[in-house]
Amino acid sequence: GIMKNHYKALSAIPKIFYKQNDNDNAKGSDSVHIVIDPNGGFQLWLGEAKFYNSLEDARLYEPINSVEQMLRKPIMKKECGIMTNLNELDKQIENQTLLKKIKECFDENTSIDEIKPKLHIPILLLHECQITASTTEMSDEYKNSIISFHRDRAHSFFKKQINKLSSVHKYSEINFHLILFPVPDKT
């Protein structure tokens, strides 16, 4: 929903169809979307999503490790291969010139290095939050508290991510988006 409604993204791979069983996670990224630029270009969005009971520092390594796995050549090639072999984009993109350009970009012969500048990685961390649990209305006090808390967690997350992933080739050309979503509790 966030990808479609906020970023106007097109679903490129319906991940639900690639689960092996009910308790299985989708392999590779959790979501695969294409965002069309107003100037006729496009971006590849490979998303990661986690649900935590807290955002303490120790929990932040798991999504970073998942992103590291996602950036490995075999996994990125697999995602691109699935995308070009499905007709999901054919149903959503009427501009045939753009569709051809997208499919050529994700062709098996295209270097991953050519894809990385088009790559966006949204990382959604849905988390239990005491600030949200103790709030009954959307007050300025609540907004300021949650902004301050999320800013602190985002700084910690990106510091850890840079330390772990900055050696990935063309890391600086990849766009990362951290989306922190507080909920009162899991139930």
Question: What is each of the regions a protein language model found here?
Answer:
Residues 3, 31-33, 44-51:
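Conserved catalytic cores of phosphodiester-cleaving nucleases, focusing on short active-site segments
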Residues 7-24:
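A short acidic/basic microdomain associated with nuclease active sites
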Residues 137-187:
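Extended, charged low-complexity segments
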Residues 1-7:
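Long, mid-chain structured domain cores
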Residues 23-35:
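Charged, often glycine-rich, active-site loop that binds/positions anionic groups
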Residues 60-147, 155-156:
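Acidic, metal/cofactor-coordinating or nucleic-acid-engaging core segments within structured domains
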Residues 45-51, 55-65:
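Metal-dependent phosphodiester-processing active-site neighborhood
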Residues 37-42:
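Short, solvent-exposed loop/turn segments that connect beta-strands within catalytic domains
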